[in-house]
Amino acid sequence: MNGTEGENFYVPMSNKTGVVRNPFEYPQYYLADHWMFAVLAAYMFFLIITGFPVNFLTLFVTIQNKKLRQPLNYILLNLAVANLFMVFGGFTTTLITSMNGYFVFGSTGCNLEGFFATLGGEISLWSLVVLAIERYVVVCKPMSNFRFGSQHAIAGVSLTWVMAMACAAPPLVGWSRYIPEGLQCSCGIDYYTPKPEINNVSFVIYMFVVHFSIPLTIIFFCYGRLVCTVKAAAAQQQESETTQRAEREVTRMVVIMVIGFLICWLPYASVALYIFNNQGSEFGPVFMTIPSFFAKSSALYNPLIYILMNKQFRNCMITTLCCGKNPFEEEESTSASASKTEASSVSSSQVSPA
């Protein structure tokens, strides 16, 4: 084996030289230069000072504006809550460990950090699945006269938490485990060892199938059908001007949604799958560190994509930040009517399928 396995860790370096140390007790500067740990700490600090305000503002603005308390926005708020879980439960911990060069909070802290990071990421992922299904049902109309109400939104939010817990909780109770990964400053699922006594292989397979492949398939299917439906409606010149605008807006949103998801999670999932399929092979600590830390940026991407691109949310945010006045209101007044019609077309199922 080209790594060193301990009771609750796996360091991707052979201990033939005798330099490998427990990542819960000793700095890991033998894995990489000091400046790399400093870069990780700076990156986590950036995610905290940007991710927290944007996600907190999403919650605050929704509470302040009654018109935003719509069923669909329950899911968007769930995304913000999930991202805050990642910020407080994962990012702050990783910032401190990166500054110290090792996981100073011990095995228990590793379990908590891994749990909250996984929970937040999975809530975000399944929230996107619920959004995709809602968009598909409302716009493509596979069921006639369906209206997405509060009960559907609450059920969707509940589903995200159930599925997230089904992924994040098992390693805490003996099915797989959380261990430090990469430069040993953040924790994740053990992809590195078979560990038969905790049935690690079966859990990793379960996680990749149920909590990655299936959600990704659903998202691609729903948004693929949505784009086709909007294009067909536009081609038939149904409500031509607003539908054409809706087509452009929805297409742009879908492209950014898919790209954002893939940019955040596909590199991490691909590297994790490679490591899992090649356990014991030689790879450096940076090999997993970069995609692992890059996946954490989803806490910043999500609100920018799903909240800030929503005109109603954006206007309410500007009004809140500017103490009740929107300085851009006059500039947008000429398109306000069209925007409302567009929102109705896309969000209230007025865009008819072919």
UniProtKB/Swiss-Prot annotation:
Any single Pfam family the record assigns to this protein: Rhodopsin_N
PROSITE patterns: G_PROTEIN_RECEP_F1_1 (PS00237), G_PROTEIN_RECEP_F1_2 (PS50262), OPSIN (PS00238)
Glycosylation sites: N2, N15, N200
Keywords on record: Cell projection, Chromophore, Disulfide bond, G-protein coupled receptor, Glycoprotein, Lipoprotein, Membrane, Palmitate, Phosphoprotein, Photoreceptor protein, Receptor, Retinal protein, Sensory transduction, Transducer, Transmembrane, Transmembrane helix, Vision
Sequence segments annotated as region (Disordered): 333-354
Sample GO molecular function, one term: 11-cis retinal binding
Protein name stated in the entry: Rhodopsin
UniProt KW Plastid keyword: no
Low complexity compositional bias, start-end: 334-354
